[in-house]
Amino acid sequence: MPKLEVCCYSAECAIEAEQAGADRIELCCAPKEGGLTPSFGTLRAVRDRVALPVHPIIRPRGGDFCYSAAEFEVMLNDVAQVRDMGFPGLVIGLLDADGHVSLARMRRIMHLAGTMDVTFHRAFDMCLNPYQALRQLTDLGVARILSSGQQQSAEAGLALLRELTELSRGPIIMAGACVRLTNLHKFVQSGIQELHSSAGQFFPSGMRYRKAGVSMSADSEADEFSRYRVDSEMVANMKHALTVLPVATRPA
């Protein structure tokens, strides 16, 4: 049966996702940045309260995946921290300036991670040659690749996801980006083994008093009175659907 990984942006979300039936959690913060490295406090709270496999993301900033030497040093420290805290896996991705997998840096990451399960995230969707990247990540020993098939949504990139799944002799190809209950069947019928979804939405903040004309964001139009959280019912419905959908056989 295909597995459902839920992207969680807080300890509260991780607890809700586990209770709703998720198979694994990708732990992040900053949903509007696409997911950044969670704080130590969040890591510790989730480690202590969630029994599911939790894979924190290692991403020091938003934007592209070509990092400075100082940023890479931060990432190495974060990898060591999540490893030493006992997390079974992590999520990371590094490219060079020309859009190739940053091999030298990824080798250092893999060595530092040791026996941890390493997922190469959607930096894969920004690389120049996905076939070359698949070969390189296979050689590195990466456990899985999170991808939308190099399109804005995984459904739009389904043809490439299917092809990569057939080609891969190592990493699991995990579909992510706009994966929802309404399109789960398309991925399952294509032989995709793992699915990644935020399975949530923005809800109004609990603040009653809302100061007008002052923003904590560089974007003065940003809505700072909403919070993203996992929708437990959505997770449960997606998980149930995966138990009843017919599964395609992966080619040998």
From Swiss-Prot:
InterPro entries referenced in this protein's UniProt entry, alphabetically: CutC-like (IPR005627), CutC-like_dom_sf (IPR036822)
A GO term from the CC aspect: cytoplasm
One Pfam family it belongs to: CutC
Primary localization class, coarse: cytoplasm
Keywords on record: Cytoplasm
UniProt superkingdom: Bacteria
Annotated compartments: Cytoplasm
A GO molecular-function descriptor: copper ion binding
Homology family: Belongs to the CutC family.
NCBIfam families (UniProt xref): PRK11572.1
Protein name: PF03932 family protein CutC
